[in-house]
Amino acid sequence: MRYSLLKILTEGLTGNRGWPPVWREPEPKTDYDVVIVGAGGHGLATAYYLAKEFGITNVAVLEKGWLGSGNIGRNTTIIRSNYLLPGNEPFYEFSMKLWEGLEQDFNYNAMVSQRGVLNLGHSDAQRDAFARRGNAMRLAGSDAVLLDTEAVREMCPFLDFDNARFPIKGGLWQPRGGTVRHDAVAWGYARGADSRGVDIIQNCEVTGFQIENGICRGVETTRGKIRAKKVAVCVAGSSGRVMEKAGMRLPIESHVLQAFVSEGLKPVIPGVITFGAGHFYVSQSDKGGLVFGGDLDGYNSYAQRGNLPVVEDVCEGGMAIMPMIGRARLLRMWGGIMDMSMDGSPFIDKTDIGGLYFNGGWCYGGFKATPASGYCYAHLLARDEPHPTAAAYRLDRFRRGAMIDEKGQGAQPNLH
């Protein structure tokens, strides 16, 4: 079924009795061309583009829990392409272009809202770094505007310009950045993949890999063995545990990242704002709640919940730039498991085991990368060669000395 205004009006007048299920609940077959482990944003996007762009429809997406129960529904919904390094910026700009046409592409309202992303600067050195980053973005075909203090004040008069501990010296603005309804992204990709014949199998945990003579021939699951010509893993923070079942160790650590939403407030924040002297980022949802987050909890964890010191630290960051939120009450908070790589950049690559592919290490950048990650992973699976924009995301880059350290923090995952 194709969604349209006419269909909505028709169903509204007839009691909404004609809507079919958005996707099927199929039983797993015994063999597929491709088995994708993980029905999050990246896994579903990969299945969608395999079917749509490359004509491979004999695909299964296996999910331990329910569709979209991982990080795709736990992030702060921000999309942007304001990266510096040549290994990153073209990829994220490709993702931004896919975001811009996403809703028309899969005929689903993902609520893409390009209201801009503003990174605040608080020193002369930071302003110079923003100028460098903005120039790199524009060279890669993206958009960037360097703002002075008065331009930031005109855009966001509610910020603390007069008494802030870290004075606002300006900012870097990406007008095309913004937010997207994260659950709708999962549902839209699932609907699009399912309509093209992909089997999305929920409550089906992968318990092992069928490896014969160094080649992966399929997976073992709680619902039986499934053979496959290719097995593609994209399970975010569970990457280490899943790939360990294939005898692999990854240059990745798992950390918990918390996110928060306040009670509903009147519209005040025009887009996304980030604090440059700490780690705090905030946007406002359609319901009026402030959606914000900050740093990792700092210790290894597989729990989808965090601890109170980070709550205090994040709220202090918010108060530092806009004290007006001090009387707003927190509505809820949650956590997601981040797959933090050693240089802060991801992997989309073949493994040393034939027929086994890996997508992970996304750190903070997983949600905004969803369309490009799915497209590039599908390209790799279909053609057995990397997509040009993801060619740098190789598993062997540490051995080759080809790190992509966007923040320059070194090999400490919880700092990226």
Predicted feature residues:
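Extreme N-terminal leader/targeting segments of oxidoreductases
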Residues: 1-34, 52-56
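Glycine-rich Rossmann-fold phosphate-binding loop(s) that bind the pyrophosphate
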Residues: 39-42, 64
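Short beta-strand to alpha-helix junction loop
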Residues: 90-93, 120-129, 172-191, 201, ...
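Dinucleotide-binding Rossmann-like beta1-alpha1 core, especially the glycine-rich loop
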Residues: 76-158, 309, 317-319
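Glycine-rich FAD pyrophosphate-binding loop
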Residues: 51-72
